[in-house]
């Protein structure tokens, strides 16, 4: 089993990084969409972009989140990192990002259905969490 993990570990890491990149890109795109929406006038038909953004979220961002979770969990288990001090901090930042994504998905669904909602932009929080996750994963303090 250890030999299998040793062989698959580089692939798991690659899958983890690619899926994380897709997930973060989707969350940032939604955040930027909310910013654009806040800046434009009410005369523009908003649900069209929201439907497209929501569809993208369903087919790309959400699956990437689950693939990131699964591959990260496998890597952490086989790397025996659950006793390390940096992993809980990384998981906390990941959970914050997952929560932001859930909130964004809800807003996108409501906007796509024509419901007028108040949108919040979370770009700075997303960037801080992403940078923190990357630093913790590389440095492993």
Task: Give the predicted meaning of each segment.
Residues 1-141:
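Polytopic transmembrane helical bundles with strong interfacial aromatic enrichment
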